[in-house]
Amino acid sequence: GMHPEQVPYSTGDVVDAAISLSVYDSPRGAQLSGRILDLHPAGLGTKLAEQAAFVVALRRGTPLTEEQKKLITPERSDIVTVYRELQARRWHAEDLQPLCAKLGEENTGKTLVAVTALEQVGLIATVEKGGAKYLDLVPAQGKKNLADAPVLKCLEGM
């Protein structure tokens, strides 16, 4: 089982769930037991997985087409949007699907690259709280230049 704080969703989040149900007899009558097999934001299409695969390919050094690079290269405003969202709510570090869904499935690649860039320049870090890993803002030590993030340099140089 998982503790509730390890689930990357908050009260009110709309999710699609795959559940295994079983019915068993007990002295009080038939009982229903359920086990969650998978959770993800409701209504996700294929864009999230497709763009996430481009980001994985980028990290592995696999060449991307110009079109693929354009899909996952964030503008400064995209990175600011991700930073503000991380400021507004505690997001799980190990499952970024809810964050990507909130910021638009079509922006998944840009969101994932923005999170990586923010981590690489030291503006955010993964911290463990209550058995779960979260993305947390790091108090800035001097000025940070997003252009110094290796992931962004890699996208420019491809």
Question: Model-found features: residue ranges?
Answer:
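Acidic, two-metal ion nucleic-acid-processing modules in DNA metabolism proteins
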Residues: 1-158
